[in-house]
Amino acid sequence: MLYALLIGGCGGSAPSPRGVTSSAQSSEASAQQLRPQITAEGSCVQVEVIAHGADQGLMCATVALAKGLTILDLTDTWTPTLFAPTAAGQVPSFHDRYLQLANERDAADHPIEGEDALDELYGVVPALAIVRARLADEPRHACHAAIDPAPILALDKTLSQDSKQDVALADQARVVFATQLDREKIRRKLSDPTPLATDPRWQDKYARWQKLDAQHTALVTAERELHCEGWLSDKDTDGSFTWRTGNAIEMFQRRNFLLPTERLDPDTRDAMQTSSRELDFRLALRVLRERVVDATGIIEDGTASSGPLPVLGRMLDPAAMRAARGGRDPMPNGAPDLVSPMTEAAATQLGWTGPEEVRAFLANHPAGGRVAVLLPPVPAYHAPHMELSAEIDRGDVFYDEQPPPFRRIVKHRPSLVLYADDHGTRRALVRWPTTIGGWADQRLADGSLVQRWKESDVGPRVWRDVIAGPTWLAPKTTPDRELVKNLWNGHWALKTEELGPGPHSAYGMVLLEHLQVFGLKDGGERLDDNGIGTHGSASVTSIVNGTSHGCHRLYNQLAVRLGDFLLRHRNHVVKGELPVQYRRFVRHNDEAFKAKIDTRGFAYELTPPVAVNVLKGNILSRRKVPPRALAPARP
């Protein structure tokens, strides 16, 4: 079998035209490789059995499994299967960094802060030590409890940094109206200006002041909530909207698993109505959910049927993550939500019914540990090796001759569906939002910048390699300006986080390359790569409304779930780290940087590969083929 090497990816990389022979290794069912630490030959690895919040004593892990119990890893050294040590003792290079990010402590045991912290939204499941610390943070909870969040609900529009000038002008008008009303109150010898609300000469001015004052009070209240988290200083809780306000809102959104828009949008305003302890409890449930998914090997989350269910009455994901626009109707033979009921069952067995109960449990289990609980059975079609396939619907496609001057909001967004053969029935397991290509900047050979259409290839492909902790080898066509970030102190820095590996990598946490199969005259096959793949993404909001450079982006936490599911339910071989020598000098504003990457990631080869079919979608533009002309680069 021949395989055309991938260099980079849908970030504009050109695939290698050469092919190399695939390594011939014997494949083994992934179930044999999964958690080797749970059992040890000739010994009893004990786990704690818990039922309805009560400790039932210790039991050998093998006995617990034989009794139909599920073993949950609640240690702070847990990682998804993708990043865990293999049965042969191989450790993915990203393993240690994953644990550092999950525990929010770096290699020197210093706190990870700023933009490097709060990576749950980008695919890193927080350690239970983080949950324990947040629930026990009494000063923070007391600060929030002293604030009545109700005034925030008076906002009837979304505010952002773009609203800075409007907010400032509105506040000036508020002060002017308040001064005028106060003077009239004094002139009439009123105790308060309320009677002016019904005075024909003053009611309009009073109504305008009242609305502006409600907006000001709402902003001040929201900023006080953010101050409790340490993200705003006292002087920034003045009702203005600055870049510091936007940054603080983004941190709040990242901490509470909301889309990181930096906007005071409806979801964020609603979350601010929720107590800090309740928000921390929801974090605990999200952490537990990923441990349950890992332990049971399930992936079915209801997105292919009637949608995800609440866990203990709580929806754990924002609505935008539950379905692509235009893809909410149940699919034929769509699998029901198993993830939420399984998580709720685990929470009930552990006694995690509220913030105080979780806090007490974690206080009694400071080291975490592995526990055995009784959970509902997994579907009968689950097996160590399953017949799986995937389909990507490109949704509504517009082949515009030139980049449109606005962001097009299509009715039918792209989606990815994973199927399983359920004893002859093609069962849709999940249906997740994704992206397709569009217009993007590209550097030409002469150094000039243009925009070029980045097409998402249509037709049958396969996923052969699952690459955990992938790096992005930025091709020469990627402009230098896209590889640097402004430090806002007169200097720039290389975007090492975008090169990876890590949650902010251009490929996210997992990459599944799309390979095209060609038959050879000798009966063999050649696998060609065109630089397109399915992968995680730190560009969370682009999955809701944006486009890519041709690849199919997934929310990082879902990409990790998909990669884990493939390893649990598909024969594979461990290829290990993929060495590479990537070097590039990046120059911007008289500063130079050297990019250095020595691995493409830790690879697992699926045997056989999983079939993927990319549908043409609904081409709604007059033009029916991708545009070939270039367009001026974005300013």
Please state what every model-predicted region is:
Residues M1-G9:
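Bacterial N-terminal signal peptides
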Residues C10-P635:
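N-terminal pre-domains immediately preceding structured catalytic cores
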